[in-house]
Amino acid sequence: MLFHLGKSKKSTLIGSTLVAAVALIAAMIAMPWDLEISQWVRLKHIPGDLRRFIHLMEIFAHTLGCVMILSTLLWIDQRNRSKLWKAAMFVLTCGLLANLAKYLIPRRRPSTYDREPWSWLNPDRDPDSVFVSSWDAWGSPLTESWFNESIRSFPSGHTATAVAMAIGLTYVYPKGKPLFLFMATVAALQRLIAGAHYLSDILVSIPLTLLVALAWA
């Protein structure tokens, strides 16, 4: 198999299926409250150095960052070059699929809202504000401009890429699995803090990437 993340193919399949199912269920639960959750997270005070660290970790999910990381590894680790090429192709595939999906399903990014949502998470909200719902962010499939990035929220391409990087690098360097998963988690959190994606966008990207991994296995 291409990616070996467990003691056997069966355990890998079971574990991946469970993670995908939990992520999908969590996404469905979060979806009605996405805008409220996004605002609550963005209003939370995060110490300066920690916030900078979280934003810097976007490199693990950004196309150019991934190219730099994988190119460096391909250059310095000739022994694992074959595996690294497979990992790179896997990351590329996951990123392309996630971005294709977001171009088919329009959804406004949370950072584009200048009105606060009705929210029990925001006790200091202005009672005279015009409120919007999390459902208002969705558009009709294939009806919006393909070049309007402000409506390309669902799913999170960055998260799909970060999870793919964690899986691909774990395939090449199994001992680094905890570090790779940590980096992917922080990269996904960065998308929420930056207002680029809703929580459900991030969660849905996980089973999407796992599905591709199982197809490659």
Where do the protein language model's features map onto the residues?
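Aromatic-anchored segments of alpha-helical transmembrane domains
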Residues: 24-28, 92-100, 184-195
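Short helix-capping/hinge motifs at transmembrane helix termini and TM-loop junctions
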Residues: 31-33, 77-78, 105-106, 194-198
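Hydrophobic alpha-helical transmembrane segments
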Residues: 58-73, 158-169
